[in-house]
């Protein structure tokens, strides 16, 4: 059954999207960089505010806010579809989708919930045993907020 997404301008959402068959697509640094580049491009095109993110080997968590007229569903469709297209052109020449259909979205209703999800996202690599400290995980917004690392400044501003 297809779940309805609640697209309302200015709402803040916790988004999770999972790779097809939980394939660890994002163990590849080039795949991570490609996703970051596309996320930055579509953030600008769709007027999306990216508040936090983590790219795990087999899934991605985002906290986003739509500021424009396009839906979150359209944003995710373009992001995932074009990632698959460019991934297949550049990295792996098969034509298969890299993501499961759809995505999970949850409206964040208050600051307490936002802080809990923010913490959850940044600690996901620790929870999964990928690093001992979130500051050691490269594809996360953690360092931007806690260490003034400017690597993802364009994405997060």
Which ranges hold each PLM region?
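Short catalytic/metal-binding and nucleic-acid-binding patches
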Residues: 1-157
